Amino acid sequence: FQINSDEYGIPQARKRVIIMGIRSDLMSSGGPRRYLEKSHPITVKEILESMPKLRSGISKINGQSIKDSEDVWKKEVLNWFGLKSKIKDKEVKELLFKHFLPAIKKSSLSRGDEFFASSDYKKSCNNLPKDLKKWLFDPKLKGFINSSTRSHMDSDLKRYIYNSVHTEVYGKPPLLDDYPDFLQPNHANKKQGVHKDRFRTLDPERPSKTITSHISKDGHAFIHF
């Protein structure tokens, strides 16, 4: 039978087929579903807030490959301060320049790793539902595993920042027509109206459509809020 996995404590909004064998003498009119207990959906926000804050990497600036570092990344992100006059949306501008960028300026973020020790690991799952915490948390570990970020070129990084701030303001990601001119991608099919929502920020208040990862074919669709 088929279930919506996000209705059963799995932080992924996908339909899943489960094959379950039940002895005929235990079977009831309710079918196998009576053995499943629904739980409240686990949101993107709940999952990401239980993990350490990380920065992305940066791979290219103005088309030239560069060596990533926190200083290079932060300098490129903070270049937004010089673009203020190009942002016409007042609400996006206010959140971006009064809150988001000042927070980045004060931050000190790593990119994670296959494993990195952290004193925050023990309390990281405290706010998650008990069953999910039991599944994710291993007291023998002293840090986080398989939590690392990918690199992006500077133009995409700027689009991701604008996209996430716009999503915070309006509750939905911008379409291509909503971007300022200097953030418009140089895609051949842009004017054809194809994939106008190719850049999408995850809704923090809903389960993710997939376990988030930067995949070459759809990496723009899972921007973190």
Where are these regions (language model features)?
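Conserved S-adenosyl-L-methionine
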Residues: 1-7
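Conserved hydrophobic/aromatic beta-strand scaffold that supports enzyme active sites
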Residues: 2, 16-20, 210
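Residues at the C-termini of beta-strands that transition into short coil/loop
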Residues: 4, 52, 215
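Secondary-structure junction/capping motif
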Residues: 4, 43-46, 153
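Short, flexible, glycine/charge-rich loop motifs used to bind or transfer phosphoryl groups or to couple energy/partner
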Residues: 7-9, 200-201
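Flexible, glycine-/basic-rich loop-and-beta segments that form/coincide
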Residues: 9-67
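C-terminal target-recognition/interaction regions appended to catalytic cores
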Residues: 69-225
